[in-house]
């Protein structure tokens, strides 16, 4: 197929033209079509690869997601291309394809430096192989960090992963609307102390506040609405 393919010329685009329209999941309401610009998207995603995920152009990166979701859009396809690193595209599940060692085999075979996936994936692995017997079959010396997002990462799952992998397990938070992390421990800048059930602090470029119903700033341990600028 490649040998018979014809070249496609590059086409100049304005930086503020649309890269894509991707719809939100609709979990809390009607799905919203999110329009992403080209220029800002490129700048932001390339910046995150080094500063949040500590990935260089000669590293192997794996985002175990689906291209139909924002994580797959941003971190299977676009961000690795902008950074120039190798990206792993995996079609399968963390268990049953063929077993609970599927993730470890891929990390070992391709010398993956960092993995980004959903907490559900690790809950499934933990359920099938709580003692980590499959993990011990593979060489994961290349592996340096695990990033979790997409849903709440419960402390039990994070602790299990930390004990098994012996690498930082980082819960970070973002949405389809942003296309990259709002808050995270930035491994390429400086690792910060954090606590379980926390997605650390706002990533550079974001101003995050908790606002009460009277529009005043919430104090520590007070409930309110999240406001992001």
Q: Predicted regions span which residues?
A:
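Conserved AMP-binding/adenylation subdomain of ANL enzymes
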Residues: 42-60, 70-114, 127-133
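Conserved AMP-binding A3 loop
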Residues: 19-43
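Active-site phosphate/pyrophosphate- and oxyanion-stabilizing loops and adjacent acidic/basic residues
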Residues: 47, 159, 197
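Conserved pre-ATP/AMP-binding loop-to-beta segment of ANL
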Residues: 1-23, 30, 54-60, 143
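Short Gly/Pro-enriched turn/cap motifs at secondary-structure boundaries
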Residues: 10-13, 195-202, 217
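Residue(s) in the substrate-gating loop at a strand-loop-helix junction
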Residues: 66
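Gly/Ser/Thr-rich phosphate-binding loop
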Residues: 85, 113-117, 126-193, 207, ...
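Conserved beta-loop-beta connector loops within the AMP-binding
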Residues: 209-229
């Amino acid at each position: 197929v490649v040998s018979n393919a014809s070249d496609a010329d590059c086409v100049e685009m304005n930086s503020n033209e649309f890269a894509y329209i991707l719809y939100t999941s609709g979990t809390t309401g009607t799905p919203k079509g999110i329009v992403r610009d080209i220029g800002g998207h490129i700048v932001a995603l390339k910046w995150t690869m080094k500063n949040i995920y500590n990935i260089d152009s000669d590293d192997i990166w794996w985002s175990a997601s689906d291209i139909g979701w924002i994580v797959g859009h941003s971190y299977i396809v676009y961000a690795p291309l902008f950074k120039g690193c190798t990206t792993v595209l995996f079609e399968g599940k963390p268990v049953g394809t063929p077993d609970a060692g599927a993730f470890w085999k891929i990390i070992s075979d391709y010398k993956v430096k960092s993995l980004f996936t959903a907490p559900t994936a690790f809950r499934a692995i933990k359920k099938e192989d709580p003692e980590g017997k499959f993990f011990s079959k593979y060489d994961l010396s290349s592996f340096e960090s695990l990033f979790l997002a997409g849903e709440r990462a419960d402390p039990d799952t994070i602790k299990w992963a930390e004990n098994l992998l012996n690498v930082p397990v980082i819960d970070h938070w973002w949405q389809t609307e942003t296309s990259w992390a709002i808050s995270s421990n930035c491994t390429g800048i400086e690792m910060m102390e954090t606590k379980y059930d926390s997605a650390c602090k706002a990533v550079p470029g974001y101003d995050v506040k908790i606002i009460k119903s009277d529009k005043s700033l919430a104090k520590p341990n007070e409930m309110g609405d999240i406001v992001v600028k």
